[in-house]
């Protein structure tokens, strides 16, 4: 939620044909996927701060800049805002400019004590023109800059942050310190980009990936001052601190659409590579599974007596899939918790509990808070994450990175498959370590996992046109139901979520066994129902029961869309539409059956003319509670 960009460069660099405004606007475009409702920029030039801001998309801001240009500069900041305090208006957009027009501030997060601070600042004679907590933070910073910090912007930021409560990232520039940006972070993302004769700040590396792949992750409660020649990090008290350098593993081209109409469509097609890259490098020369990233003592992992998977949204459904596999392979009781519920229900967690978190961005605030709570109770935490340099891996005991590459579309696709793959690897590793499975059994499952990338490609090649046609035909549906059993149940939940997110229509996923306990009342003539059918080569009773469920809804007038593996003839008599996927063991099926549901949701949204990559009201990275 919200995107932040900062740039400082030398005034004269050979062969450089861009200025601060170019860098900042490009960074904001790269960060659009995070979700926003207004945008703004500010630069320091000729001893003054110049700024523009506009409700709406970055394109609206660019149109404003065409009619009202800003001066060239080598220092600037930019922001895309997701409204929390105050509506999405020009006045509430960032940057907020105070101190007689000399100080510009952008902010991501929520200042929880802003009302108290605002009252105090009103007492000092300051006035406010917006409804935002950001203007309060900016005014406090300006007040301290002039009255307590001897006009030292870094010191003023340190003193300001000591007064603020909540989660925030702040970037500030001042006309009287025209060579630097000062930034702070607490429980909100901020990454430093390191160039030659220029340096950058961003909510994530997408904000500066066009210019450098060298980055530095900051810790919590830190402040950084960047100039053209370097950066310096302190804590909020002014003590010297260090960041952790890393190199971004992908380039700007990976964050382009690459010929596809939508980022989501591209990312659906990148899923074979996402699974393959998540598997890569996690086996020794003999083929044995080795997870070197798990910096947790083996004796500790052997003593685990409970696993809790913590996540939100799509990642939580990946966790539900993983639960079936982990319990089956490891024989360890496994729970799946929504992060925002976990913290508030007094969960039973101790030193024999292993917490596994799933987060694509690594910045999901509810999940981050759950990590801290779990560790306070003595649990070990393993993060499964797609973003290097993010907060959740840094605060966990170990991390398995999914290596899925940048996921730009708000609705998650390839991260979901990569998360399932990574949790499967973790489950197999624990089973191997604890002696729950023989080596040949582990190798057999790994062999099946290695076939998944090609099978996902086969799904894409085999059913994409069929599913897109179905989506076009069903674009006027007002409600769609999804049914599944066993691992097909969380797939049904994910299919429903995708349709809600993208097509803005009622969609619900149910455990098929619950039909007669209530949901069957929703079935009427013409009701579309997707059914995920388990392999007939698995538990016969499971397959037979799902076929029976198809018969039940079909008999009541439902339009049945069945996802079944090749060769499963039992469904043909009861399906209006059959989407065929390659044969795979039951636990592998979610990695295949999910793909047509992603294509369907994308197709319905496109047919309705909706923004596929940036659905209304949604943000890619939910960085506030």
From Swiss-Prot:
Signal peptide: none annotated. Residues 296-436, 470-615 form the SIS domain. It comes from the Bacteria. One of its GO terms (cellular component) is cytosol. InterPro entries: GATase_2_dom, GFAT, GFAT_N, GlmS/AgaS_SIS, GlmS/FrlB_SIS, Ntn_hydrolases_N, SIS_dom, SIS_dom_sf. It is found in: Cytoplasm. Residues 2-229 form the Glutamine amidotransferase type-2 domain. One of its GO terms (molecular function) is carbohydrate derivative binding. Keywords: Aminotransferase, Cytoplasm, Glutamine amidotransferase, Repeat, Transferase. The active site is at 2 (nucleophile), 620 (for fru-6p isomerization activity). The keyword Repeat applies. Pfam families: GATase_6, SIS. It catalyses: D-fructose 6-phosphate + L-glutamine = D-glucosamine 6-phosphate + L-glutamate. Its EC number is 2.6.1.16. The keyword Lyase does not apply. GO terms for biological process: carbohydrate metabolic process; fructose 6-phosphate metabolic process; protein N-linked glycosylation; UDP-N-acetylglucosamine metabolic process. PANTHER family: GLUCOSAMINE--FRUCTOSE-6-PHOSPHATE AMINOTRANSFERASE, ISOMERIZING, GLUTAMINE--FRUCTOSE-6-PHOSPHATE TRANSAMINASE (ISOMERIZING). Homodimer. NCBIfam families: glmS (TIGR01135), PRK00331.1 (NF001484). Catalyzes the first step in hexosamine metabolism, converting fructose-6P into glucosamine-6P using glutamine as a nitrogen source. HAMAP family: GlmS. This is Glutamine--fructose-6-phosphate aminotransferase [isomerizing]. It comes from Corynebacterium diphtheriae (strain ATCC 700971 / NCTC 13129 / Biotype gravis). The lineage of its organism: Bacteria, Bacillati, Actinomycetota, Actinomycetes, Mycobacteriales.
